[in-house]
């Protein structure tokens, strides 16, 4: 035994002797229940967590309620599922169409496929019209030919009254009207001759 361990053992022995001198119960450190309260608390004792009523009867409910036969009463949930609450609020506030339109925007690749989604971009939805820009005029032309199929897929997924029309645009041409080297006049005339 080292000197530190001997010092600790002596300290514990002094504590035990002092507890015995005061007629206190010396805890057995090997017992798991050594520090549990062995005497019940007085019922009306407010300092010890009682109800303070002083009537001698503890009126606090403890545990699950039981029926007259002693079995637990069934637990009845009064909470409504979160999905049902959200759906009711969405309908009552008139957000159904807006949420469906947002779904179309966020799931565009799922609706048209990854190849088309790679070359197209949903710009906005306004008045049941879906505005789409394409990388090239060729993709814009192909998308215009597929317009009916795309509208059918959207109607199947989110409903018929969400998107009624597709507005498909090609890439924007560069503007010659702005920039640090802009010269007043008609612009480049024979550049595209």
Swiss-Prot record:
Residue span of region Disordered: 17-74
Listed Gly residues bias regions: 47-56
InterPro entries: DciA-like, UPF0232_actinobac
Entry's family note: Belongs to the UPF0232 family.
Record-linked HAMAP family: UPF0232
PANTHER family recorded: UPF0232 PROTEIN SCO3875
Protein name per its UniProtKB record: UPF0232 protein CE0005
């Amino acid at each position: 035994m080292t000197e530190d361990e001997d010092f600790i053992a002596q300290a514990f022995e002094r504590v035990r002797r002092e507890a015995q001198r005061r007629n206190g119960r010396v805890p057995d450190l090997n017992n798991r229940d050594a520090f549990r309260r062995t005497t019940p608390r007085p019922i009306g004792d407010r300092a010890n967590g009682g109800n303070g009523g002083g009537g001698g009867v503890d009126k606090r409910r403890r545990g699950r309620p039981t029926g007259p036969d002693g079995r637990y009463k069934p637990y009845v949930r009064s909470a409504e599922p979160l999905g049902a609450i959200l759906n009711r609020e969405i309908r009552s506030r008139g957000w159904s169409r807006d949420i469906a339109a947002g779904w179309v925007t966020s799931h565009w690749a799922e609706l048209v496929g990854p190849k088309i989604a790679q070359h197209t971009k949903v710009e906005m939805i306004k008045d049941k019209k879906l505005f789409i820009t394409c990388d090239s005029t060729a993709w814009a032309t192909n998308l215009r030919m597929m317009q009916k199929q795309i509208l059918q897929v959207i109607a199947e997924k989110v409903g018929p009254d969400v998107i009624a029309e597709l507005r498909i645009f090609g890439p924007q041409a560069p503007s010659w009207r702005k920039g640090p080297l802009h010269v007043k006049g008609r612009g480049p005339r024979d550049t595209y001759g």
